Every structure is written in structure tokens, then in C-alpha cells.
Design a protein with these regions (language model features):
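Aromatic-patch recognition
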Residues: 69-178
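General N-terminal leader/first-domain-start detector
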Residues: 22-80
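Hydrophobic alpha-helical segments, principally membrane-spanning helices and signal/leader peptides
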Residues: 4, 42, 101-102
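Bacterial Sec-dependent N-terminal signal peptides
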Residues: 1-27
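Hydrophobic transmembrane signal anchors and adjacent membrane-proximal interface regions, especially
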Residues: 18, 46-48, 52, 156, ...
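Generic detection of intrinsically disordered/low-complexity segments and helix-coil linkers/edges
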Residues: 1, 9, 25, 32, ...
């Protein structure tokens, strides 16, 4: 009698535990099928955006729209991506293939990225756009985005981002902030 109860308990546990594991595996396989070789990019945090009801502007480089680009991630180049760069959080944002989820790319593994016609390279703790590059010198631009003073508009207080641009001229391995 006790053996039957133990046997039934083992069967019950087997079905209860293995069923969800099998389901998770099929979801993982489906994700890899859709993402393909680009799955490595889609393994980080979901982006928490900026509500237009709270902020009067955005902290993204140039525009808050996604632009076609490429990322050199862990030594591999991934092309035909929709990207935007958040200068406040210093995060590259990528949109998944089905265009439903916005994800932050793990910046520790990013060697460089290209958005539109601008190439971004590491500069201290952020990324800078290359404006001019030659064997003699390089001119880059980066943005030190910070939270500015609140703005009142129609009796409603909004927060705003200040995005002062900084330019760096590099010559003979020495950086000069312009």
C-alpha cells in the first residue's frame, strides 16, 4: 500500500516538474528560431522609456526614433538592426525582430556601434560619435546628458534633459577637449 502511494507521488511530481521545463524549452527554441544568430543581443534588460507626460524632451542621441544600424558585440558584427542611443543612461537600445520589445544591449561587450551614418566608439564611460577620422587626427563628439531644472508648461511641471555636446580632438594619442 505504501509503495503505491510513493509510486503515485513520484509520477505526480514527474508530470508537474517536467511539464513546465518542457514548455520553457519550447519557448526558448522559438525565441532562438526568430532571433537567429542575433539572440546574443537580446539577452539583457528591457528598456524603461521616458513618458511624454513627465519629460519635455528626450535623452536619445539625435532623435527618439529607431534608426538602422550595426553593433560590434563581443567581436562579432551584427547588421540590419534598429537602434537608438540613450545618452542619459549611456545605453544602446535595440528592438527585437518582431518589433515588440525594446532591450538594452550589454555595453560591456560593445566594441563600437553605428547608427545611421555615424560610428560610435568608447570614450571614458560613454560612447562618442566620430565626426572626422584620419591617420593624423580624430574628432569625436559625445553628450554628457543630465537632468535639468523642471519646466512649467500650462501649470504642469515637466522634467527636462540637458544635453551639452563635448568635442574631443585626438592627435598623436593625446585627447584635447575642445
Amino acid at each position: 500500500m505504501d509503495i503505491r502511494k510513493v509510486y503515485l507521488l513520484i509520477l505526480l511530481c514527474t508530470f508537474c516538474i517536467l511539464s513546465p521545463v518542457y514548455t520553457q524549452q519550447s519557448l526558448s527554441d522559438e525565441f532562438r528560431k526568430v532571433a537567429g544568430d542575433y539572440a546574443a543581443l537580446y539577452t539583457s534588460k528591457v528598456e524603461v522609456g521616458y513618458s511624454p507626460y513627465l519629460y519635455i524632451n528626450h535623452p536619445y542621441w539625435d532623435t527618439d526614433e529607431f534608426k538602422k544600424g550595426a553593433v560590434c558585440y563581443g567581436g562579432l558584427v551584427y547588421t540590419d538592426l534598429q537602434l537608438r542611443y540613450d545618452t542619459f543612461k549611456k545605453q544602446l537600445i535595440v528592438i527585437t525582430p518582431e518589433k515588440r520589445i525594446l532591450l538594452q544591449v550589454d555595453m560591456r561587450k560593445v566594441d563600437y556601434f553605428i547608427i545611421g551614418d555615424k560610428k560610435f566608439v568608447p570614450h571614458n564611460d560613454t560612447f562618442a560619435a566620430i565626426l572626422y577620422d584620419s591617420p593624423q587626427m580624430r574628432l569625436t563628439q559625445y553628450v554628457q546628458c543630465k537632468m535639468g531644472t523642471p519646466v512649467e508648461k500650462g501649470r504642469i511641471s515637466y522634467r527636462q534633459f540637458e544635453k551639452p555636446a563635448r568635442f574631443v580632438l585626438s592627435k598623436d594619442g593625446v585627447d584635447h577637449t575642445v
